[in-house]
Amino acid sequence: MPSLKDLRNRIASVKATQKITKAMQMVAAAKLRRAQEAAEAARPYAERMDAVLANVSASISGADAPPLMAGTGKDDVHLVVVCTADRGLAGSFNSQIARLAREHIRKLQANGRQVKIITVGKKGYDLLRRDFGKLVIDRIELREVKQIGFANADAIAKKVIGLFEAGEFDVCTLIYSRFKSVISQIPTEQQIIPAAVPQAEGESTGAIYEYEPDAGAILADLIPRNIAVQIFRALLENAAGEMGAKMTAMDNATRNAGEMINKLTITYNRQRQAQITKELIEIISGAEAL
């Protein structure tokens, strides 16, 4: 049984930890608001970009489609870009993304496909290196970036497109966590090469559009930008999801610390009461002996 001194030290230690988790919860809450606003602001742009691509791509035939949309015509080598956080203390946020990545990679391998991996975020590599360390061809960390910008996503997109143009892979899939709410983040996989151009919505108005330069040249310029936009959106969604998961995890940790403090305090009071009672009995017994 721990002594009263040990219990006092444990209570003080847990209280110090509780202060830290509470502070981290408040910081995550402040960052969450900014990250959520950025993620929600990026969605309309990404959706509008899809609509523009759908309209332009509808006017060209498959033979005229740029390579990033037409693909290589093969399905042998797959590049998987796994986006996670650079830091932990976010509950199951990173492990859920890694779980989806493992399932996707193993499914490809079971079908005889060769897999290459790029990890964006330190935790992604840490979680995947045991099973797929030899498949990782590049590691990208953004821990020094205070606020994710389009330039970060554009650099990743250029790296991926460069690998495609060098014949390093046939299909590229992006895996990240889509932000739904503070307590809900959805691991998502999205094919970005060959670019999955959505069908144009709505009924045809009969209008005839002329593109200058031709539609193929416009697509050749738009698709690389769209790949960067989709990666940027994934990074923003990830950032919002990470802050939401971290805020929830720190809130739970703060609550658990409070419960532990209460239990330790009760134990401390009981032992102190027992010790006082024992001392009183000893004093009374001594007085009676006299």
Swiss-Prot record:
Organism in which the protein naturally occurs: Chelativorans sp. (strain BNC1)
Compartmental location: Cell inner membrane
Alphabetical list of Gene3D superfamilies matching this protein: 3.40.1380.10, ATP synthase, gamma subunit, helix hairpin domain (1.10.287.80)
GO MF annotations in UniProt: ATP binding; proton-transporting ATP synthase activity, rotational mechanism
A GO cellular component annotation in the UniProt record: proton-transporting ATP synthase complex
Identification of the protein by name: ATP synthase gamma chain
Subunit structure: F-type ATPases have 2 components, CF(1) - the catalytic core - and CF(0) - the membrane proton channel. CF(1) has five subunits: alpha(3), beta(3), gamma(1), delta(1), epsilon(1). CF(0) has three main subunits: a, b and c.
InterPro entries reported for this sequence: ATP_synth_F1_ATPase_gsu, ATP_synth_F1_gsu, ATP_synth_F1_gsu_CS
This protein's record includes keyword Cell membrane: yes
Keywords: ATP synthesis, Cell inner membrane, Cell membrane, CF(1), Hydrogen ion transport, Ion transport, Membrane, Transport
Domain of life: Bacteria
Membrane topology: Peripheral membrane protein
Principal cellular location given in the protein's record: membrane
Protein function: Produces ATP from ADP in the presence of a proton gradient across the membrane. The gamma chain is believed to be important in regulating ATPase activity and the flow of protons through the CF(0) complex.
One Gene Ontology biological process: proton motive force-driven plasma membrane ATP synthesis
Coiled coil: none
